[in-house]
């Protein structure tokens, strides 16, 4: 029974990720005035399955000088963390109803750095290591902004529970009242998931492929799946935090359809950004965070703390 539950949980996420890769290739194709994958199946719809069969049936190669255990553990850890991050998300029902759901997601997104760092270090390649170190610096930096934004949301929400956010946003979505936070959160999630224009870790022109340059076949596919699962999870988080439930939220299916639609819309924006913008320079990436996002998020966090105290003359009841 446990195995069946596990498969029911994992397979839909992996299927969604598979079709997201197809949609991305199609979107990029049409934006560059070409067709994209259109050979395997009608309109290329079976392309992800062909890719999966090809990757998982090839021999997984590894460099002779690599550290075997870390080299193997890194992609497994990446995919495990990417799948685990979905457990506390209310869609509208959660798999695990955690009291500290916001903290759990923040800590898991921070842990994903280790898989990238291990893969870069264990590969024993200078390109992989440079890509991994870039990823660590980038992710840790943007984690600061994400943490402060989540703290601000927690002050509005009154608790760390994600389900409470649905009750908080019954009358008005938080994007209406905290739109600067929404914009900064969305841009920070782009950086957190190493997506264009912040894909410094995978700079093809200078690092060949980045931290996963020495990976092939199955382990490479695991990193690929983890990246796209993280993208969808982050967009699901954006929907929960700022775009709330629909106005008629008494019906579970209405909530679920609305949640799926908004997550798909945000994910499509990720693809649009990738097709439209060039890569940031590394100093611009850090300047954006430390000189722009950090002061603004701190100021907004202080505002959310001070307004209830100023208006009620007493500390808010948490």
Curated annotation (Swiss-Prot):
Q: Membrane-crossing residues?
A: 3-23, 68-88, 100-120, 136-156, 172-192, 223-243, 253-273, 294-314
InterPro entries, A to Z = NADH_UbQ_OxRdtase_su1/FPO, NADH_UbQ_OxRdtase_su1_CS
* Membrane topology note: Multi-pass membrane protein
* Reactions accelerated catalytically: a ubiquinone + NADH + 5 H(+)(in) = a ubiquinol + NAD(+) + 4 H(+)(out)
Keyword annotations from UniProtKB, A to Z: Electron transport, Membrane, Mitochondrion, Mitochondrion inner membrane, NAD, Respiratory chain, Translocase, Transmembrane, Transmembrane helix, Transport, Ubiquinone
Disulphide bond pairs = none
The answer to keyword Mitochondrion applying to this record is yes
Q: Where in the cell is it found?
A: Mitochondrion inner membrane
- GO: which molecular function terms? NADH dehydrogenase (ubiquinone) activity
Q: Which GO terms describe its cellular component?
A: mitochondrial inner membrane; respiratory chain complex I
- What's the superkingdom here? Eukaryota
Coiled-coil positions: none
**What EC identifiers does the entry list?**
7.1.1.2
EC class, as a word, reads translocase
One of the GO biological process terms: aerobic respiration
Q: What does this protein do?
A: Core subunit of the mitochondrial membrane respiratory chain NADH dehydrogenase (Complex I) that is believed to belong to the minimal assembly required for catalysis. Complex I functions in the transfer of electrons from NADH to the respiratory chain. The immediate electron acceptor for the enzyme is believed to be ubiquinone.
Q: Which family does it belong to?
A: Belongs to the complex I subunit 1 family.
Name the record gives this protein: NADH-ubiquinone oxidoreductase chain 1
């Amino acid at each position: 029974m446990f195995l069946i539950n596990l498969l029911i949980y994992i397979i839909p996420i992996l299927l969604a990720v598979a079709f997201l890769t197809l949609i991305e290739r199609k979107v990029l194709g049409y934006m560059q005035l070409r067709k994209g994958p259109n050979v395997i199946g009608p309109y290329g719809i079976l392309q992800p399955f062909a890719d999966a069969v090809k990757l998982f049936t090839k021999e997984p190669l590894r460099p002779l000088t690599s550290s075997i255990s870390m080299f193997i553990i890194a992609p497994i850890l990446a995919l495990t963390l990417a799948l685990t991050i979905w457990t506390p998300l209310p869609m509208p029902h959660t798999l695990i109803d955690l009291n500290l759901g916001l903290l759990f997601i923040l800590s898991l997104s921070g842990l994903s750095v280790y898989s990238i760092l291990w893969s870069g270090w264990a590969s024993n390649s200078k390109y992989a290591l440079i890509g991994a170190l870039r990823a660590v610096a980038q992710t840790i930096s943007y984690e600061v902004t994400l943490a402060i934004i989540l703290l601000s949301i927690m002050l509005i929400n009154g608790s760390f529970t994600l389900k409470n956010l649905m009750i908080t946003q019954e009358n008005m979505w938080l994007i209406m009242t905290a739109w600067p936070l929404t914009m900064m959160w969305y841009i920070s999630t782009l950086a957190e998931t190493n997506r264009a224009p912040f894909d410094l870790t995978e700079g093809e022109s200078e690092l060949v492929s980045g931290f996963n340059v020495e990976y092939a076949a199955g382990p490479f596919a695991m990193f690929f799946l983890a990246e796209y699962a993280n993208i969808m999870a982050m967009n699901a988080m954006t929907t929960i935090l700022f775009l709330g439930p629909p106005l008629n939220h008494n019906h579970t299916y209405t909530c679920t359809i609305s949640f799926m639609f908004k997550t798909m819309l945000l994910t499509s924006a990720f693809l649009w950004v990738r097709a439209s913008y060039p890569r940031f320079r590394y100093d611009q990436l850090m300047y954006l965070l430390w000189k722009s996002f950090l002061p603004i998020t701190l100021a907004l966090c202080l505002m959310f703390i001070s307004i209830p105290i100023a208006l009620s003359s007493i500390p808010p009841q948490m």
